[in-house]
A protein has these predicted regions:
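Asp-box/BNR beta-propeller blade signature and adjacent active/binding-site loops
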Residues: 1-132
Length: 132
């Protein structure tokens, strides 16, 4: 196997000031041949502030639009860390499907290191009729 080309979906714009990383990407090719990616941005791999972002490419992934949050929902009672993937249906509806771990606070890990229990999670779905 050899690497033909390297594509960067997300780079932290302020790495000296803010710790952010992009993880768990999913990419679909839309009907107009553009690419759409959903991925998660957060402070750390297991951080409670993980949110799903969307970005598009019109040049086969060589460059990407500035990431935008998939939604603007504000969690009032308990925070959720989420990850969703795109799925293009035959009728050209675009789904974002995934899950969100319910976080009792920002410092509780997803997996309890003593009991190995996993935090509860909620299934998530979002539907787009306009290619995201």
């Amino acid at each position: 196997m050899r690497i033909i080309d390297e594509i960067i979906l997300y780079e932290n714009p302020e790495p000296l000031l803010v710790s952010k990383q992009g993880i768990f990407p999913g990419i679909v090719k839309l009907q107009d041949n553009s690419l759409l990616t959903l991925f998660t941005i957060g402070q750390a791999f297991d951080s409670a502030d993980q949110r799903t972002y969307v970005s598009k490419s019109f040049d086969d992934g060589r460059s990407w639009s500035k990431p935008k949050p998939l939604h603007n929902h504000i969690y009032k009672n308990k925070e959720e860390s989420e990850s969703l993937k795109p799925l293009l249906l035959q009728n050209n509806k675009l789904l974002a499907i995934g899950y969100a771990f319910v976080r009792p606070d920002s410092l509780t890990p997803i997996v309890n290191p003593n009991t190995f229990e996993i935090l509860p999670l909620n299934n998530k779905i979002s539907i787009s009729n306009d290619n995201g």
